[in-house]
Amino acid sequence: MNSSPPPANSANGDTTNNGENGQDLNLNFLDKIRLSAKRDAKEDEGEELPTELNTINSAGGFLVVSPDKLSVKYTNTNLHGHDVGVVQANKPAPIKCLTYYFEIFVKDSGIKGQIAIGFTKESFKMRRQPGWEVNSCGYHGDDGYLYRGQGKGEPFGPKFTKDDAVGGGINYASQEFFFTKNGTIVGKIPKDIRGHLFPTVAVHSQNEEVLVNFGKKKFAFDIKGYEASERNKQQLAIEKISIPPNIGYGLVKTYLLHYGYEETLDAFNLATKNTVPPIHIDQENAIDEDDSSYALKQRKNLRQLVRNGEIDTALAELQKLYPQIVQDDKSVVCFLLHCQKFIELVRVGKLEEGVNYGRLELAKFVGLTGFQDIVEDCFALLAYEKPEESSVWYFLEDSQRELVADAVNAAILSTNPNKKDVQRSCHLQSHLEKLLRQLTVCCLERRSLNGDQGETFRLRHVLNNNR
């Protein structure tokens, strides 16, 4: 096992002239900084939810919507089949979620009880019951039938009338519509309508009146419990997949090796000593532990220095052990280390020293393609009395130190003389991370096949939901 660095003048260790792969390796970390700036904004980016009824786009001649826009009453006389009072929500159902659900409460079933609940497209004809037209579906109270895209319904569930709470929902995971009555699911059907759908309510005979609940009040149906059950189904399906213990062991081990977490690796090996079958993971899955173990102690020590904010010491160690990494003072690794040194000075309030350091080391990157925006963001730290509360707060997070440590780690791994230039970009991620990236792509592809509807895969959310 080769865990020592190559000679300082090793041609194979030159990270400054590795062609496109070396350049991609370096630029990857600059892109990660830019993503840090957008990370929380993207994760918190929500959708507008339906909150009330749309009084502009409705069959206004046959119904009256209350001032709070949460109840509707049929006030006309039903003389024709198309004298329907239809009203949609003010916004379409959200699509970046596991489920969507809303309810109505039948305050008065009127003369005929021809109340309906369902989903329609924005272009739906507002004098037709939901389900009578294409691209719509509706559960009707007078016969308990489900209508979807035509005037003829199909047996579906019980009728509903005065004092009943009836709900309509979309399960994006199973691609189904489902409907409830008084807190119990009465049926579900395949969701064969693409695009944005609006929660829709219809009344069709004199004095029919319903109250609409978009979630401001407690639902009769336990939607949170339903979602938990759906997630549990997904988890059980995953757990049925049999994976040999040594596969998971190998992935975790090479992850720890890749990032130089030597002490954690020792503890992990000790904890799994008597539980993992003695099968050599390399032969089974082509995971090369020798490559991941390369310069392990050096990488561990340098990571710790960066994580502690000891940038001067880290630079000195790199100069001593891997001068080829820092010989170009305008390389990405040097840039990241100098940025981090500047950040550490700002962190402890040494602003004047930070200004001087910035003029000496960061000014050389001003105007260089790929660096300018990050330099400006770094300098912006000086403009705030409390930079940790500013728009560039992420520079002061521990994750920023980890990112710089990862860049140094990858640069050292790329000096491995046993690796060809074309293989060096593989040091950007461990095998475990590559697997998770593939999983993310597969989940995105599945979501694309469902019309870009449903939850997007976020590992952090998955882990939190399965604790």
Curated annotation (Swiss-Prot):
The lineage of its organism: Eukaryota, Viridiplantae, Streptophyta, Embryophyta, Tracheophyta. Residues 1-25 are annotated as: Disordered. Residues 31-219 form the B30.2/SPRY domain. Keywords: Cytoplasm, Nucleus. This is Ran-binding protein M homolog. Pfam families: CTLH, SPRY. GO terms for cellular component: cytoplasm; nucleus; perinuclear region of cytoplasm. It comes from Arabidopsis thaliana. Transmembrane segments: none annotated. Residues 244-276 form the LisH domain. Residues 9-25 have a biased composition (Polar residues). Interacts with WDR36, WDS, GID8, MAEA and RMD5. Belongs to the RANBP9/10 family.
